[in-house]
Swiss-Prot record:
InterPro entries: ConA-like_dom_sf, L-lectin, Lectin_LegA_CS, Lectin_legB_Mn/Ca_BS, Legume_lectin_dom, Leguminous_Lectin
Any coiled-coil regions, as ranges: none
Protein's UniProt name: Arcelin-1
Task of the protein: Seed storage. This carbohydrate-binding lectin has toxic effects on an important bean bruchid pest, Z.subfasciatus. Antibiosis properties of legume lectins are proposed to be due to the lysis of epithelial cells of the intestine by binding to the carbohydrate moieties of these proteins.
Record bears the keyword Ribonucleoprotein: no
Gene behind this protein: ARC1
Gene3D superfamilies: 2.60.120.200
PROSITE patterns named among the record's database cross-references: LECTIN_LEGUME_ALPHA, LECTIN_LEGUME_BETA
SUPFAM superfamilies documented for this protein: Concanavalin A-like lectins/glucanases
Molecular function GO terms recorded: carbohydrate binding; nutrient reservoir activity; toxin activity
Amino acid sequence: MASSNLLTLALFLVLLTHANSSNDASFNVETFNKTNLILQGDATVSSEGHLLLTNVKGNEEDSMGRAFYSAPIQINDRTIDNLASFSTNFTFRINAKNIENSAYGLAFALVPVGSRPKLKGRYLGLFNTTNYDRDAHTVAVVFDTVSNRIEIDVNSIRPIATESCNFGHNNGEKAEVRITYDSPKNDLRVSLLYPSSEEKCHVSATVPLEKEVEDWVSVGFSATSGSKKETTETHNVLSWSFSSNFINFKGKKSERSNILLNKIL
């Protein structure tokens, strides 16, 4: 009888340990405030509760701002080979002084916890080199106003996937963005809609996040503006929600639990 009780307790502890070993995350920001953000560079929050990434003084040259959610997000649990899926929705407005000569754009990014701003300009405050740099541990979805396209960048400003999107035509208009990551398929998908013009843009790529970013990341935004008055633009994020969850990735969680149970039995 005692042996049976011990076995039941052992089973419970194994299942409890693995049920709680990964950390799901969820938040919804309808109005930004400085208490739930890590602000870097020129980034600030307006009195209306909007996230202002660049040009806080108005048409500021060579401006750069980054803002990340204050709590780290777990992407990978190596103890059970479990990778998180996630989805994020946000709205933004980019306003260029001269739509024929604007720079550089805005990005949603996963960066290392404690990351500091990188180079300005086309590097968007996220990278220090043009070439692939595995040590960057950064994956970004870039809304590139120079090339008028959406990019998926993995540890480099050289994109692994692009799709044209006319930011100039929609200058100053609100954009609605949804990004999803399906961990079993390593599938990263981006959808953008401008309600005012009904223009839609889509891009996707295969990104094995467990190889490209650290297990815990900071999620948020980065933007840079041009180095001359005629190339300046503002980048404002109006709302943001994010949700991540761990699923039974390729059956490995169950396999590991079974191994542990077999050892007990």
